[in-house]
Structures are given as structure tokens and as C-alpha cells.
């Protein structure tokens, strides 16, 4: 009885043949349908009805379980016979009632298999369906790959993914910030406001925004750009007006609040009042001043200028267009922008825009003519030295005679 039920149920398992000693060997009409049934369809299990086919993802799993059960129940020889059976049906030896009943059961199952095979080809699983999100991701991948390869994705040309990416619109003005086009009236008002004030406070900005029908952000950005343009213009003007510029090795200008030592206004008997030194009287026609000092320096371009205030020793100034003092010792005196301790009054002097060049310990002092004890109108040497004064004692505080200028 158990064998009979087993062979009766065998019709449901894909139409395989299970021969008995007293029955015919039979085969399905076509093994292709049986193979399709065993591969893709899970309706061959005895639990399910052959007509109902649930669209689930676990069909293959159920099919595998059923086939495993059938293979465990069947013999090894029968399995090999199933794999090696040719397409045409085999000849039958002797019919039996059991085989006829199994054929009756087989016929509806085979018809169900034939009706289910077209459904397999038409069925689309959820993971096969193309959703909007998948399409968008695919379009993004194609577009990015096309941009990397330099291909025209935005013109509808096929990209590396083999599709024409029409999903994305080409990047136009909508994706970028629109450039603000100011009218002439707005530009005039903005320029006028910038002329009076380069930085706008917020109340004034709000007022101008309402007046010019602009946003505060537009006005703020316009003022930022205008300030940058103004800085560039100032830089270009500065370079154009001063071709040499203020290089670090150029001497600083001697006209300023820090250089108030000697000036051309000392004429008419005005004395220079330092904190401790006595007033200088008897000014002559051309006093040593800033104008007189800077006048001869216009013709020469100094290379190097170092003021060593500690090494400066003050020197007396004689008459003939110079200051002199009999009691300059032990008193700080303003020389070349520095107050230094004075030495005894000596022969060399400042005379009408010429730097004194007394001979002694050398101090680097460029753009000054190298002048020994005598005065001479000579050209500027590139690297002359400003030397200290020889300590000539002034006899009884009297002024020494004026030395002559000579050019070395």
C-alpha cells in the first residue's frame, strides 16, 4: 500500500518516471517543460494546488525542498535514468491498472505545467522592477560617468551606460545665481553713496534698498566689490606716481614731525632751544636745514643708510653759513634725527646742504659726499662713510676757521 501511494504521488513531482516490476515505463511528453517546472516552479509540492501559483520570492526555495525530498525518496539508479533519458518516449512492456491511474493523475499535472510555463516568462519579481529611485540613481551614474569622460550627456547623446540621459535638465541659469543687472540710475546713486561713505551702516543700507528697489544683500555685495576695485585703483596709482617706490634701502624722508631739529626758519636770529644746549645765535644767510640737507640728495640714489647714534660724536659748527657754539661739550645735541652726547667743538661744519666729513673713526653713512676737512662741491659717492670728528679743542671756545671741501 505504501508503494502504491508513493507511485501515485510521483505524478506530481515534475512528471518523472518511477517504474515498477509489473507496470509500464512512461515518460512525460516533453522533458523541457519538466525541467522548467523543476527549475522555476514551486507548485509541484503536494501541499500546493497545481492551479494556484502564489507570486512569492520563495518559490525557488520551496522547489528545492520538494526536489530534495523526491531525490531522497527515489533510488540513485532512477535519478541517473532521469538524467539520461532521451526526448522521445520509451516503449512500454505491459500495462497495469496502477499505471493507468498514475497516467490519469499525470495528465492534469502536465496540463497545469504547460499552462504555468508562460506565466514564468511574464513574471517580474520586485527586485527586477525599475522604480523611480533606481532610475534616478542610474541616471546620476551615467551622467557623472559622462562628465568624467568628457562626453556630451546633456545633449541627449548615449553615455557609458548605454542610455540617453534625458531625466536631468542641462544646468542653466536656474541652477546658478542670476547676475544682478543694475540700472544707470541705481549705479549713480550707489557711486554717490560710495563717494561719501565706503562702508554703509545697516539703517542706511535699508534706506538705499528701499530707494533703489534692491535687496540689502545686493547693496552689500556691490559695496564689497566696489571697495576691492577702489583698492586696486589706489595700488595702481601709487605705483604709477612713484616709480622707485619706497624701497627698504631708501632713506626715510627727513621732513616730518620726527625731524624737527634744524629748520630753515632759524633765520632772523631765532635760536635752537634744545633741552640743555645753549641757544645758537648768529645765524647766517643759508642755515643748515632740512631743505638744504635734502636738496643735494636728489641727484644721487643712496644704496645704504645706517644711522649709528651711539657712534655719532657731535661736532661744533663754524661760521660761514653754519652754527657754532663754544660750549657744546657734555650736552646732548640733535644730529641727523638723534640726540647724542657732544664732543668738543671741532673744525668741520654743516654748510649749505653739505654733510660734514671730519676725518676719524668711520661710520657707514651713505648718500653723503665723502668730505674731508675742506668743503668741496663734489658728486655723491655710492658708499661714502660718515666719519667722526677729530677732537680739535676750540681755543677759548672760539670758532675754528672753516675748512675747505675736497673730493677724494
Swiss-Prot record:
<dbReference type="InterPro" id="IPR009057">
    <property type="entry name" value="Homeodomain-like_sf"/>
</dbReference>
<feature type="region of interest" description="Disordered">
    <location>
        <begin position="1"/>
        <end position="27"/>
    </location>
</feature>
<feature type="compositionally biased region" description="Polar residues">
    <location>
        <begin position="134"/>
        <end position="143"/>
    </location>
</feature>
<feature type="short sequence motif" description="Antp-type hexapeptide">
    <location>
        <begin position="124"/>
        <end position="129"/>
    </location>
</feature>
<feature type="region of interest" description="Disordered">
    <location>
        <begin position="376"/>
        <end position="408"/>
    </location>
</feature>
<feature type="DNA-binding region" description="Homeobox">
    <location>
        <begin position="175"/>
        <end position="234"/>
    </location>
</feature>
<dbReference type="GO" id="GO:0048704">
    <property type="term" value="P:embryonic skeletal system morphogenesis"/>
</dbReference>
<feature type="compositionally biased region" description="Polar residues">
    <location>
        <begin position="387"/>
        <end position="398"/>
    </location>
</feature>
<dbReference type="GO" id="GO:0000981">
    <property type="term" value="F:DNA-binding transcription factor activity, RNA polymerase II-specific"/>
</dbReference>
<keyword id="KW-0539">Nucleus</keyword>
<dbReference type="Pfam" id="PF13293">
    <property type="entry name" value="DUF4074"/>
</dbReference>
<keyword id="KW-0238">DNA-binding</keyword>
<dbReference type="InterPro" id="IPR001827">
    <property type="entry name" value="Homeobox_Antennapedia_CS"/>
</dbReference>
<keyword id="KW-0371">Homeobox</keyword>
<dbReference type="GO" id="GO:0000978">
    <property type="term" value="F:RNA polymerase II cis-regulatory region sequence-specific DNA binding"/>
</dbReference>
<feature type="region of interest" description="Disordered">
    <location>
        <begin position="132"/>
        <end position="179"/>
    </location>
</feature>
<keyword id="KW-0217">Developmental protein</keyword>
<dbReference type="GO" id="GO:0005634">
    <property type="term" value="C:nucleus"/>
</dbReference>
<dbReference type="Pfam" id="PF00046">
    <property type="entry name" value="Homeodomain"/>
</dbReference>
<feature type="compositionally biased region" description="Low complexity">
    <location>
        <begin position="91"/>
        <end position="116"/>
    </location>
</feature>
<keyword id="KW-0804">Transcription</keyword>
<dbReference type="InterPro" id="IPR017970">
    <property type="entry name" value="Homeobox_CS"/>
</dbReference>
<comment type="function">
    <text>Sequence-specific transcription factor which is part of a developmental regulatory system that provides cells with specific positional identities on the anterior-posterior axis.</text>
</comment>
<feature type="region of interest" description="Disordered">
    <location>
        <begin position="233"/>
        <end position="278"/>
    </location>
</feature>
<feature type="region of interest" description="Disordered">
    <location>
        <begin position="44"/>
        <end position="120"/>
    </location>
</feature>
<keyword id="KW-0805">Transcription regulation</keyword>
<dbReference type="InterPro" id="IPR020479">
    <property type="entry name" value="HD_metazoa"/>
</dbReference>
<comment type="similarity">
    <text>Belongs to the Antp homeobox family.</text>
</comment>
<feature type="compositionally biased region" description="Polar residues">
    <location>
        <begin position="68"/>
        <end position="83"/>
    </location>
</feature>
<dbReference type="GO" id="GO:0009952">
    <property type="term" value="P:anterior/posterior pattern specification"/>
</dbReference>
<dbReference type="InterPro" id="IPR001356">
    <property type="entry name" value="HD"/>
</dbReference>
<protein>
    <recommendedName>
        <fullName>Homeobox protein Hox-D3a</fullName>
    </recommendedName>
</protein>
<dbReference type="InterPro" id="IPR025281">
    <property type="entry name" value="DUF4074"/>
</dbReference>
Amino acid at each position: 500500500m505504501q508503494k502504491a501511494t508513493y507511485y501515485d504521488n510521483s505524478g506530481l513531482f515534475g512528471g518523472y518516471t518511477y517504474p515498477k516490476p509489473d507496470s509500464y515505463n512512461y515518460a512525460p511528453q516533453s522533458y523541457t517543460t519538466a525541467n522548467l517546472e523543476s527549475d522555476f516552479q514551486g507548485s509541484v509540492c503536494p501541499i500546493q494546488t497545481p492551479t494556484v501559483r502564489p507570486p512569492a520570492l520563495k518559490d525557488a526555495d520551496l522547489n528545492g525542498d520538494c526536489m530534495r525530498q523526491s531525490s531522497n525518496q527515489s533510488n540513485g539508479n532512477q535519478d541517473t535514468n532521469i538524467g539520461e533519458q532521451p526526448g522521445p518516449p520509451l516503449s512500454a512492456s505491459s500495462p497495469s491498472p496502477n499505471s493507468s491511474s498514475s497516467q490519469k493523475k499525470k495528465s492534469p499535472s502536465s496540463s497545469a505545467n504547460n499552462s504555468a510555463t508562460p506565466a514564468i516568462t511574464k513574471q517580474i519579481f520586485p527586485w527586477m522592477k525599475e522604480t523611480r529611485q533606481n532610475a534616478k540613481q542610474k541616471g546620476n551614474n551615467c551622467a557623472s560617468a559622462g562628465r568624467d569622460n568628457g562626453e556630451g550627456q546633456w545633449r541627449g547623446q548615449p553615455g557609458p551606460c548605454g542610455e540617453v540621459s534625458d531625466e536631468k535638465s542641462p544646468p542653466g541659469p536656474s541652477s546658478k545665481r542670476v547676475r544682478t543687472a543694475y540700472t544707470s540710475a541705481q549705479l549713480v546713486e550707489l557711486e554717490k553713496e560710495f563717494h561719501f561713505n565706503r562702508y554703509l551702516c545697516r539703517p542706511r543700507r535699508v534706506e538705499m534698498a528701499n530707494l533703489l528697489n534692491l535687496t540689502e544683500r545686493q547693496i552689500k555685495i556691490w559695496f564689497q566689490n566696489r571697495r576691492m576695485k577702489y583698492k586696486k585703483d589706489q595700488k595702481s596709482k601709487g605705483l604709477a606716481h612713484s616709480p622707485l617706490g619706497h624701497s627698504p634701502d631708501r632713506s626715510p624722508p627727513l621732513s616730518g614731525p620726527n625731524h624737527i631739529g634744524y629748520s630753515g626758519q632759524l633765520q632772523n636770529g631765532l635760536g635752537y632751544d634744545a633741552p640743555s644746549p645753549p641757544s645758537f645765535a648768529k645765524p647766517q644767510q643759508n642755515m643748515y636745514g632740512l631743505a638744504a640737507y635734502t636738496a643735494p640728495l636728489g641727484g644721487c640714489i643712496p644704496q645704504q643708510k645706517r644711522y649709528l647714534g651711539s657712534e655719532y660724536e657731535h661736532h661744533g659748527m663754524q661760521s660761514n653759513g653754519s652754527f657754532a657754539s663754544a660750549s657744546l661739550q657734555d650736552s646732548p645735541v640733535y644730529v641727523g634725527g638723534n640726540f647724542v652726547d657732544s664732543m668738543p667743538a671741532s673744525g668741520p661744519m654743516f654748510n649749505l646742504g653739505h654733510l660734514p666729513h671730519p676725518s676719524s673713526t668711520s661710520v657707514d653713512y651713505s648718500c653723503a659726499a665723502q668730505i674731508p676737512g675742506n668743503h668741496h662741491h663734489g658728486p655723491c659717492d655710492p658708499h661714502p662713510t660718515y666719519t667722526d670728528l677729530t677732537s680739535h679743542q676750540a681755543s677759548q671756545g672760539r670758532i675754528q676757521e672753516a675748512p675747505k671741501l675736497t673730493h677724494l
